[in-house]
Amino acid sequence: DEYGLKLIAAQFNHGLRQEQSDEDEIFCRSLAQKFGVDFLTQKMPDPSIPRGMSPEDYYRRERYRFLDRVAADRGANKIAMGHHLQDQAETVLLNILRGSGLDGLKGFLPMRDRKYIRPLIDVTRQDIIASLKEAGVDFREDSTNSSHVYLRNRLRGDLIPLLQKKYNPRIEQNLARMAEIVRRDDDWISGHVDLILTSPRIQYQQNQASFSAEYFKSLHEALGFRLVKALLEGLSPEGRGFSSSHIQAVVDLVISSPSG
């Protein structure tokens, strides 16, 4: 009320830890009731993972579908996520190991699509826990965080502590800072690509887009690559699924073609 906000708590029960998952749901419901916040939850509708999709991607898709539905039903204009600074550092390091481009090195965005916000993205896990203890608020930890089945957990439990001890005690803060720098540079590139996409340089017809090979060759290679990426994703029904090698193959094809 102090800030003129109406809060709704939404929790997606993946059901991966059976009884513990149900206990998490009960805990969240109780905590929401304690603070007078409406609470909505849903269990994973279908545990079977579609072919060609990783478990993590499937769980994420279903989780966001649930959150989007809750926001639409309740007229909420923002969806606040709980990611903190350590989550950001882990994501950036994970994407470095995967050989990601700027999209991956940006990590979690503080705001995405003007709807998803991450108010704790610059706050450390330690500070969050300290604040909860000071306020006398109970909390639960996901028991799978200590499992080494997932690569992210191995980074959290093994690699990051090693980097902190042997190389840089502020590695998490530095990775998060790097994400900020990359976001700034990526925003500049994205802005220029958006201008090109809406300019007469690009001709659209049904599910096709065309442009002059001569014009494309005049672009900086970073802009050219991102332009092809944006066009492919914009024309694709799924809006994704193109690897860097796919995009580069199209770029090479255009560059090798006669000007015109």
Descriptions of predicted regions:
Residues D1, I8, F12, M44, ...:
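AMP-forming adenylation/ATP pyrophosphatase catalytic core
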Residues D87-T91, N153, G157, E172-A176, ...:
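Non-catalytic, well-ordered alpha-helical scaffold segments
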